[in-house]
């Protein structure tokens, strides 16, 4: 018995299924390759973040600006504040509550992560440069995060840790990822 494996001899519906499987396999391999390229690029563009962490680099100017903006925002929303360097204090029920606006409080990691996410994509340079406009948005959300933590402290200082460690740490990560996805889809 002679079996001819020529695809043209197979019924038409089986040929289509064979092509679909082949194309699905090619698309899957392409998607894996693109994901690997993205991850490599992301890590390369994250080198400034890694370098700053390893060297202990801190930019005091950004800490000062962040403190100034937060104090102005707190004051403009009716919350009395005092500031000593980068320590901001607000009145609470039994006295004052203060917190230090540290280097990590500036949102620098989130801003660098946003930069790396944008530039790791395969989009044209023009779109990437337009995406950089989202970095100030990340900074503004971070400022609101700090304001909210001081605001919630005026209600009850026990809420500060919850707001800081849980809600806003994850909230800032979510914000960066949501802005990045929005940028990829819409902008």
Predicted regions and their residues:
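Hydrophobic N-terminal alpha-helices or hydrophobic patches in metabolic proteins across all domains
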Residues: 2-187
